[in-house]
Amino acid sequence: MQNEIQFKDENHKNMYHTLLKKCNRADEETKPVMYLLALTCNLSRAKQMFDFKEMCIRPDNFEQPWQTSSSARAIRLAFVLWNGFPTAEQHELNSVYNIFGYSSWDKYFIEAIKLRYPTTC
């Protein structure tokens, strides 16, 4: 029996389902990215960070003025879970040390990892 996904609130849950429908797939790569985008973004911001037509992350848009330290950590983790993203200059920022431990969202970060690796977690 699979555990129920933990959401921050009803808005997080609704946005997660909206984003999953928008990308038309719900696999182990997509779910954690949509989960983390839903945690931190509204639909227009999620579109800045993820190309739903091409089904790819948009790291070129990472430095948006609306980013907070928590949203930046969530999106960095989403990108890492998508494809191991870090560029050479962002490698240190994407370390476990720099993503976890600074945010009240850590429990949601763990939830995203569970979505990505359901048979391991």
Regions found by a protein language model. Name each.
Residues 1-68, 76, 83-121:
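Extended, charge-biased low-complexity segments
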